[in-house]
C-alpha cells in the first residue's frame, strides 16, 4: 500500500511539473526574452557585379570579390539573430541568362534579374553592396544611399550610416538620397545601397582587402539593419 501511495505521489508530482512547464513556455510574455530579434525577418542581400563584370578595380582588388565577401559576413551575422537571408549570388557569376552575348547586354540582363529576384521574393528588406571608384585618389569613406520611393529606405540607410561612422571611425559621411540607379528605382521593397569604400583610394583599398576590415564593415551593416527592425522613432542623421 505504501509503495502504491509513493508511486501515486510521484505520478501526481510529475503531472503538476509537466503542467507548470507547459504553462511557462506557452505564455507569450515568458517566451519573448528567448526569441531572437530578427526571427521571421526575410532579408535579401545583393553583392554587386560578378562573373565578367568585375566592377571597380583597386590594384589587384576587384569590387565583385569584396562585395561577395562582405555579403557573406553580413549574412552570417543576420542568420545568428534569426533572419532568413537570401543572396542574389553566392559565387563569382552574373545573373544574365545563359547565352546572353555582349558585355553591356549581359550587364543589363543581370540587373533585370536582380530586380526580378528581389521583387518576386517575400523579403522585407534588401541591401545592395558595392564599392566606389573615381579618378581622384583623395576621396574615401563608406556611405549608404537610398531612393526616395519609400520612407523606410531613408530610415535603414541612416541607421546603417550611423553604424559605419561609429564602428569604422574613418568617415563622417551621411546617408544620401540618390536617383538614376536602375535597381533602386525598380525594386518594390524597402532597402538601401551601401558603397563600403573607395577602391580608388590606395589606403582604403588596402583596408578593404583585409578580412578583419571586411568583417568590421559587415558588422556595421548588420547592426544598422538590426536597429532598423528593433528601434522606434527617427534614426540619427
UniProtKB/Swiss-Prot annotation:
Gene3D superfamilies: Zn-dependent exopeptidases. Residues 1-27 form the signal peptide. Keywords: Cell wall biogenesis/degradation, Hydrolase, Secreted, Signal. Its EC number is 3.5.1.28. GO terms for cellular component: extracellular region. It holds the Pfam family Amidase_3. Residues 43-226 form the MurNAc-LAA domain. It is found in: Secreted. It catalyses: Hydrolyzes the link between N-acetylmuramoyl residues and L-amino acid residues in certain cell-wall glycopeptides. GO terms for molecular function: N-acetylmuramoyl-L-alanine amidase activity. SMART domains: Ami_3. InterPro entries: MurNAc-LAA_cat, N-acetylmuramoyl_amidase_3, Spore_CwlD. Its main location: secreted. The keyword Cell division does not apply. One of its GO terms (biological process) is cell wall organization. The keyword Cell wall biogenesis/degradation applies. CwlD and PdaA are necessary and sufficient for muramic delta-lactam production in B.subtilis spore peptidoglycan. Cleaves the peptide side chain from the N-acetylmuramic acid residues in peptidoglycan. This is a step in the formation of muramic delta-lactam residues in spore cortex. Belongs to the N-acetylmuramoyl-L-alanine amidase 3 family. This is Germination-specific N-acetylmuramoyl-L-alanine amidase.
Amino acid at each position: 500500500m505504501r509503495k502504491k501511495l509513493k508511486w501515486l505521489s510521484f505520478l501526481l508530482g510529475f503531472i503538476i511539473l509537466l503542467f507548470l512547464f507547459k504553462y511557462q513556455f506557452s505564455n507569450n510574455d515568458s517566451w519573448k526574452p528567448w526569441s531572437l530579434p530578427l526571427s521571421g525577418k526575410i532579408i535579401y542581400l545583393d553583392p554587386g557585379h560578378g562573373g565578367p563584370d568585375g566592377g571597380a578595380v583597386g590594384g589587384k582588388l576587384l569590387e565583385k570579390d569584396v562585395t561577395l565577401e562582405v555579403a557573406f559576413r553580413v549574412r552570417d551575422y543576420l542568420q545568428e539573430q534569426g533572419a532568413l537571408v537570401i543572396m542574389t549570388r553566392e559565387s563569382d557569376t552574373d545573373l544574365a541568362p545563359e547565352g546572353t552575348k555582349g558585355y553591356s547586354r549581359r550587364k543589363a540582363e543581370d540587373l533585370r534579374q536582380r530586380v526580378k529576384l528581389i521583387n518576386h521574393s517575400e523579403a522585407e528588406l534588401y541591401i545592395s553592396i558595392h564599392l566606389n571608384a573615381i579618378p581622384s585618389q583623395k576621396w574615401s569613406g563608406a556611405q549608404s544611399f537610398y531612393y526616395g520611393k519609400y520612407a523606410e529606405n531613408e530610415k535603414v540607410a541612416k541607421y546603417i550610416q550611423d553604424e559605419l561612422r561609429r564602428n569604422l571611425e574613418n568617415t563622417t559621411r551621411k546617408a544620401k538620397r540618390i536617383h538614376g540607379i536602375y535597381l533602386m528605382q525598380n525594386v518594390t521593397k524597402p532597402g538601401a545601397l551601401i558603397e563600403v569604400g573607395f577602391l580608388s583610394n590606395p589606403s582604403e583599398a588596402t583596408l578593404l582587402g583585409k578580412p578583419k576590415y571586411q568583417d568590421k564593415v559587415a558588422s556595421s551593416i548588420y547592426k544598422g539593419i538590426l536597429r532598423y527592425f528593433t528601434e522606434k522613432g527617427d534614426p540619427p542623421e
